[in-house]
Structure formats: structure tokens, C-alpha cells
Amino acid sequence: MSNQHTLLTSNLLPVGSNISTWWNFGSMLLTCLMLQITTGFFLAIHYTANINLAFSSVIHITRDVPYGWIIQNTHAMGASMFFICIYMHIARGLYYGLYLNKMVWLSGVSLLITLMATAFFGYVLPWGQMSFWAATVITNLLTAIPYLGTVVTTWLWGGFSINDPTLTRFFALHFILPFIIISLSSIHIILLHNEGSNNPLGTNSDTDKIPFHPYHSYKDMLMTTILISILFYILSFTPNLFNDPENFTKANPMITPQHIKPEWYFLFAYGILRSIPNKLGGALALLLSIIILTSAPFTHTSHTRSMMFRPLAQILFWILATAFITITWTATKPVEPPFITISQWTSTLYFSFFMINPMLGLIENKITNTNTNT
């Protein structure tokens, strides 16, 4: 068994010797996924998908179920940690040009969309005030679809408004989608190991590869330990750090919150949606804010893969990162000046990255060729 283990780790999983800590987020995401599925299973045992009982069942879990408060808070906080890791993972991919491994990148974008759908359905389940109104606003965007919008929305709601059938549907979808995420994750990993992982330099690693275990597996274990430590530190001292105060009140369709917003990890897309004063345009912009990631492999023009050697592209990347954070911040604010203007400008900067980066690549190629010729 020992020889088989050595053969597997040495020959099937060789990795470039110079990959950095940024390459540890994949294993951290797998840890988050396992944690979410485990805690989610125990929550599903005690949860009741009924609009009159859902809120009470969540309170019952935290108060009466042994260690229920740990399970519930770990699941809620784990979702935030999951998205922190996945945004870091995507940022690493954009910075180091890992999107050129097209199939891995496209499967990753599919994973992101599935994960966001899963998190959205899960956010509605406690049937708190903000959960209810966020679900109402977001699902109502489907009515912007020409011809089919009203039919699709009515089918999703299970009626003419968000009610008991809607909650049942959302619970069923929230339960089944993680298994689709597992399948997509398996495809993502298989495709990655088919071509092999890249490195920070963006060069071919074939001449300098080392066994994944023990050299990189211990790095993964260290980062996973740090992740779990941070998770349980927040869980112990500030368990409601990312929770909305409105969600501690049971959903009331007769009272609208002053400011409706989804969870923080959707705020960048929600901010882009709000920056466009048109329902269909906003819905398309929201969808495009995620779908535009699929364009990265097809619009790469630079001869250099990694941004490590592209100073102009680095500036553009950090403008994107700043725009992302700023959109998230403005989406937490009321829809009034100056937040509307800031949101519109930062949304423009967000999309500009994917349009300017190809042109910047061509300019860099021109500069490089000129210097080489002289």
C-alpha cells in the first residue's frame, strides 16, 4: 500500500516547485465545501420548510438542539469564508493568467454560478425580514425576461407571490445543488490535473516538478488550519459579524425594510444592478458581471502569461480589485447621491478591465518587440 501511495503522489500529482501560497485556496475551498455539506445536513434534519415554522425552527436549532448554535453559526459563517476563498482564488487566476487553461477556467466559472445560486437559496431559508425581501427583489428580476419572464417567475414562486411553495422549492434546490457542486468540483480537479498546475512565473513547469506530497500537501494543511482557526475565532467572539440585523425579525410582507440588500458576497453584483436605472439593463448587467469572466481566456493578447512581468496590467488589476471592494461598499448604502454616482463609476471600471486588458496586451507586445529589435 505504501508503494502504491508513493507511486500515486510522485507520478500522478507532480507540481511545480515554485507555486506560492496563492495556490492553497483550492484545498481551502474543498475544506469549506465539506464543512458546509456536513453542517447543512445536520441543519436540514431540524429545519422545517414552512413559512409559519421556518423562523421558529432556526431559533429551535440555536437554542434547543445540542451544539445547534455551533452548527448553525458554522454554516452561516462558513458561507462567508467560502466566498472569501473563492474570490481570492479567482483573483489569483486573473493575476497569474491561469485562465489560459480554458476548460479549467470555464468549469470554475460554472462552479461560481452554481455556488452563488446555492448561497442565495440558503439565505432565504431562515425566513427573516431581509431574507424575504431580498428574495422578492432578486427573483422579481426574472420578470424582465421578454415574453417568458412572468411565466418563469410564477413557476419559481409557485404562485403569484413569494409564499410557502417558494420556500419549499428553495429548500429543495439548496439541498440538491451542493451535490452538483461536488460533481463540478471533481470535473474541475480532473481537468486541472490533465494539463497540470501553472506557476507564478507563467512558465512551463515540466522541467522542475516535485511530488505534491509531502511538499505541497503540508502547505495546504497549514493554510486549511489557519482558515478553520479564523472561522472558529470569529464564531466564538463575533458570530453575527456578517449577519443583517433585519434578519433577526420574522419575515413580514406588510413592512418593507428601509434598505433591501442581499448577503455581502452578492453586493458587488447587486451594486452593478442598482447602478443602472433600468430593470432589464440592470438584470443583464448583474448576469454579465459574472459571465464576463468567461471572456478572459479568449481575449488574452499578451505574449506574457502572468501579470508578474506586466506592470501596466498590474495597475489595471488593482483598479479592478479596488472597484470590486468599492461596489460592495456602495451597495450597502441607500440609493441616493453620492452613492449612485460612485456605484456607476466603479461599475464602469469593473467592466473596463475586461475591455482594456486585451488592448494593453497588444501595447505591451509592441513595446517588447520594439525593444527586442533595437
UniProtKB/Swiss-Prot annotation:
InterPro entries reported in the protein's UniProt record: Cyt_b/b6_C, Cyt_b/b6_C_sf, Cyt_b/b6_N, Cytb/b6-like_sf, Cytochrome_b, Cytochrome_b_C_euk/bac, Cytochrome_b_N_euk/bac, Di-haem_cyt_TM
Residue numbers binding heme b b566: H89, H188
Subcellular localization, as worded in the UniProt entry: Mitochondrion inner membrane
Cofactor(s) required for function per UniProt: heme b
Membrane spanning residue stretches: 25-45, 69-90, 105-125, 170-190, 218-238, 280-300, 312-332, 339-358
Function, in words: Component of the ubiquinol-cytochrome c reductase complex (complex III or cytochrome b-c1 complex) that is part of the mitochondrial respiratory chain. The b-c1 complex mediates electron transfer from ubiquinol to cytochrome c. Contributes to the generation of a proton gradient across the mitochondrial membrane that is then used for ATP synthesis.
Name of the protein: Cytochrome b
Organism for this UniProt entry: Calliophis bivirgatus (Blue Malaysian coral snake)
Gene that encodes the chain: MT-CYB
